Protein backbone atom coordinates (compact mmCIF):
# COMPACT_ATOMS: atom_id res chain seq x y z
CA UNK A 1 0.00 0.00 0.00
CA UNK A 2 1.11 3.54 -0.71
CA UNK A 3 3.36 2.63 -3.66
CA UNK A 4 1.99 1.96 -6.23
CA UNK A 5 -1.48 1.66 -4.62
CA UNK A 6 -2.45 5.16 -3.48
CA UNK A 7 -6.01 4.71 -2.34
CA UNK A 8 -9.33 2.91 -2.21
CA UNK A 9 -12.06 4.01 -4.62
CA UNK A 10 -15.65 3.47 -3.58
CA UNK A 11 -18.31 3.51 -6.30
CA UNK A 12 -21.85 4.49 -5.29
CA UNK A 13 -22.31 3.05 -1.81
CA UNK A 14 -25.87 3.85 -0.85
CA UNK A 15 -28.88 3.12 1.28
CA UNK A 16 -31.89 1.32 -0.15
CA UNK A 17 -33.33 4.04 -2.40
CA UNK A 18 -36.36 1.92 -3.36
CA UNK A 19 -37.95 2.43 0.05
CA UNK A 20 -37.00 3.54 3.51
CA UNK A 21 -33.67 2.36 4.94
CA UNK A 22 -33.85 0.15 8.00
CA UNK A 23 -31.54 -1.32 10.59
CA UNK A 24 -32.34 -3.41 13.64
CA UNK A 25 -30.54 -0.76 15.69
CA UNK A 26 -32.51 2.15 14.27
CA UNK A 27 -35.43 2.24 16.77
CA UNK A 28 -33.16 2.29 19.84
CA UNK A 29 -30.78 4.80 18.25
CA UNK A 30 -33.70 7.06 17.36
CA UNK A 31 -35.14 7.03 20.87
CA UNK A 32 -31.71 7.66 22.37
CA UNK A 33 -31.04 10.58 20.00
CA UNK A 34 -34.43 12.28 20.12
CA UNK A 35 -36.22 11.01 23.22
CA UNK A 36 -39.34 9.62 21.59
CA UNK A 37 -40.46 6.44 19.82
CA UNK A 38 -39.62 5.73 16.20
CA UNK A 39 -42.23 2.97 16.07
CA UNK A 40 -45.08 5.26 17.10
CA UNK A 41 -44.21 7.79 14.41
CA UNK A 42 -43.12 5.75 11.39
CA UNK A 43 -46.35 6.57 9.60
CA UNK A 44 -45.20 10.21 9.39
CA UNK A 45 -42.73 9.17 6.68
CA UNK A 46 -45.73 8.72 4.37
CA UNK A 47 -48.36 11.13 5.73
CA UNK A 48 -48.17 14.91 5.58
CA UNK A 49 -49.73 15.79 8.92
CA UNK A 50 -48.81 16.62 12.48
CA UNK A 51 -45.09 16.90 13.18
CA UNK A 52 -44.12 15.11 9.97
CA UNK A 53 -41.49 17.68 8.95
CA UNK A 54 -39.64 17.41 12.25
CA UNK A 55 -39.91 13.63 12.28
CA UNK A 56 -38.62 13.26 8.73
CA UNK A 57 -35.74 15.61 9.38
CA UNK A 58 -34.70 13.68 12.47
CA UNK A 59 -35.20 10.30 10.78
CA UNK A 60 -32.99 11.16 7.80
CA UNK A 61 -30.44 12.93 9.98
CA UNK A 62 -30.04 9.79 12.07
CA UNK A 63 -29.96 7.49 9.04
CA UNK A 64 -27.17 9.60 7.55
CA UNK A 65 -25.24 9.63 10.83
CA UNK A 66 -25.51 5.85 11.15
CA UNK A 67 -24.36 5.32 7.54
CA UNK A 68 -21.36 7.57 8.11
CA UNK A 69 -20.49 5.84 11.41
CA UNK A 70 -20.85 2.29 10.10
CA UNK A 71 -19.44 2.67 6.57
CA UNK A 72 -17.60 5.86 5.71
CA UNK A 73 -15.76 6.42 8.99
CA UNK A 74 -14.42 2.84 9.36
CA UNK A 75 -13.25 2.75 5.73
CA UNK A 76 -11.60 6.16 6.09
CA UNK A 77 -9.85 5.15 9.32
CA UNK A 78 -8.66 1.88 7.76
CA UNK A 79 -7.25 3.83 4.82
CA UNK A 80 -5.40 6.21 7.14
CA UNK A 81 -3.90 3.34 9.14
CA UNK A 82 -2.66 1.74 5.93
CA UNK A 83 -1.21 4.82 4.24
CA UNK A 84 -4.04 5.14 1.71
CA UNK A 85 -6.58 7.76 0.77
CA UNK A 86 -10.29 7.06 0.71
CA UNK A 87 -11.78 8.40 -2.50
CA UNK A 88 -14.59 7.66 -4.92
CA UNK A 89 -18.14 8.86 -4.83
CA UNK A 90 -21.60 8.12 -3.47
CA UNK A 91 -24.86 7.63 -5.35
CA UNK A 92 -27.18 10.50 -6.32
CA UNK A 93 -24.82 13.19 -5.07
CA UNK A 94 -25.89 15.72 -7.69
CA UNK A 95 -29.37 16.38 -6.28
CA UNK A 96 -30.04 17.76 -2.82
CA UNK A 97 -33.23 15.73 -2.32
CA UNK A 98 -31.97 12.51 -3.94
CA UNK A 99 -28.83 12.42 -1.83
CA UNK A 100 -30.86 12.40 1.39
CA UNK A 101 -32.56 9.11 0.51
CA UNK A 102 -29.43 7.57 -1.02
CA UNK A 103 -26.84 8.40 1.65
CA UNK A 104 -28.40 10.67 4.26
CA UNK A 105 -26.74 13.79 2.82
CA UNK A 106 -23.40 13.83 1.06
CA UNK A 107 -21.36 16.54 2.76
CA UNK A 108 -20.83 14.63 6.01
CA UNK A 109 -19.36 11.75 3.99
CA UNK A 110 -17.03 14.09 2.09
CA UNK A 111 -15.65 15.43 5.38
CA UNK A 112 -14.50 11.90 6.30
CA UNK A 113 -12.78 11.17 2.98
CA UNK A 114 -9.13 12.03 2.39
CA UNK A 115 -9.97 12.79 -1.27
CA UNK A 116 -13.69 13.51 -1.79
CA UNK A 117 -15.00 12.52 -5.19
CA UNK A 118 -17.93 12.97 -7.54
CA UNK A 119 -19.37 11.12 -10.53
CA UNK A 120 -19.75 13.40 -13.55
CA UNK A 121 -21.80 11.53 -16.13
CA UNK A 122 -22.75 12.63 -19.61
CA UNK A 123 -21.86 14.92 -22.45
CA UNK A 124 -23.45 17.93 -20.78
CA UNK A 125 -23.16 20.65 -18.18
CA UNK A 126 -24.68 19.64 -14.84
CA UNK A 127 -25.79 21.64 -11.83
CA UNK A 128 -22.88 23.34 -10.06
CA UNK A 129 -24.12 21.81 -6.79
CA UNK A 130 -22.36 18.53 -7.69
CA UNK A 131 -18.91 20.10 -7.80
CA UNK A 132 -19.37 22.90 -5.27
CA UNK A 133 -20.42 20.62 -2.40
CA UNK A 134 -17.31 18.46 -2.76
CA UNK A 135 -15.01 21.45 -3.30
CA UNK A 136 -16.44 23.31 -0.31
CA UNK A 137 -15.99 20.42 2.10
CA UNK A 138 -12.56 19.57 0.74
CA UNK A 139 -11.32 23.12 1.22
CA UNK A 140 -12.55 23.08 4.82
CA UNK A 141 -11.28 19.64 5.83
CA UNK A 142 -9.07 17.93 3.25
CA UNK A 143 -6.71 20.39 1.56
CA UNK A 144 -8.89 21.34 -1.41
CA UNK A 145 -8.40 18.33 -3.71
CA UNK A 146 -11.48 16.81 -5.40
CA UNK A 147 -11.57 13.74 -7.66
CA UNK A 148 -14.08 13.26 -10.47
CA UNK A 149 -14.95 9.98 -12.14
CA UNK A 150 -15.56 11.68 -15.45
CA UNK A 151 -16.49 11.26 -19.12
CA UNK A 152 -18.74 8.24 -18.57
CA UNK A 153 -21.87 8.34 -20.76
CA UNK A 154 -20.28 10.88 -23.10
CA UNK A 155 -20.61 8.45 -26.02
CA UNK A 156 -18.32 6.78 -28.55
CA UNK A 157 -18.37 9.86 -30.77
CA UNK A 158 -17.22 12.38 -28.17
CA UNK A 159 -14.40 14.65 -29.38
CA UNK A 160 -11.34 15.83 -27.49
CA UNK A 161 -12.72 19.36 -27.71
CA UNK A 162 -15.92 18.23 -26.03
CA UNK A 163 -14.01 16.37 -23.31
CA UNK A 164 -12.01 19.55 -22.67
CA UNK A 165 -15.30 21.45 -22.38
CA UNK A 166 -16.67 18.91 -19.88
CA UNK A 167 -13.47 18.99 -17.84
CA UNK A 168 -13.27 22.78 -17.97
CA UNK A 169 -16.70 23.10 -16.35
CA UNK A 170 -15.67 20.80 -13.52
CA UNK A 171 -12.28 22.39 -12.90
CA UNK A 172 -13.80 25.88 -12.88
CA UNK A 173 -16.02 24.71 -10.01
CA UNK A 174 -13.25 23.21 -7.89
CA UNK A 175 -12.53 19.69 -9.20
CA UNK A 176 -8.77 19.04 -9.33
CA UNK A 177 -8.22 15.39 -10.32
CA UNK A 178 -9.80 13.41 -13.18
CA UNK A 179 -10.42 9.68 -12.92
CA UNK A 180 -11.32 8.57 -16.44
CA UNK A 181 -14.33 6.33 -16.89
CA UNK A 182 -13.15 3.76 -17.89
CA UNK A 183 -10.27 1.62 -19.15
CA UNK A 184 -11.54 -1.87 -19.96
CA UNK A 185 -9.34 -4.81 -20.92
CA UNK A 186 -11.81 -5.85 -23.61
CA UNK A 187 -14.93 -4.60 -25.35
CA UNK A 188 -16.49 -8.04 -25.69
CA UNK A 189 -20.14 -8.59 -24.85
CA UNK A 190 -21.99 -5.98 -22.84
CA UNK A 191 -18.88 -3.92 -22.14
CA UNK A 192 -19.14 -2.28 -25.56
CA UNK A 193 -22.25 -0.48 -24.35
CA UNK A 194 -21.23 0.10 -20.73
CA UNK A 195 -21.48 3.88 -20.50
CA UNK A 196 -18.91 4.72 -23.22
CA UNK A 197 -16.40 6.06 -24.00
CA UNK A 198 -13.43 3.91 -22.93
CA UNK A 199 -9.98 5.34 -22.41
CA UNK A 200 -7.77 2.47 -23.47
CA UNK A 201 -6.20 1.07 -26.62
CA UNK A 202 -9.62 0.36 -28.19
CA UNK A 203 -10.45 4.07 -28.53
CA UNK A 204 -8.66 5.74 -31.48
What are these regions (language model features)?
Residues 1-78, 82-106:
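Polysaccharide-binding and catalytic clefts of secreted carbohydrate-active enzymes
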Residues 70, 74-77, 82-204:
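Hydrophobic targeting/anchoring helices
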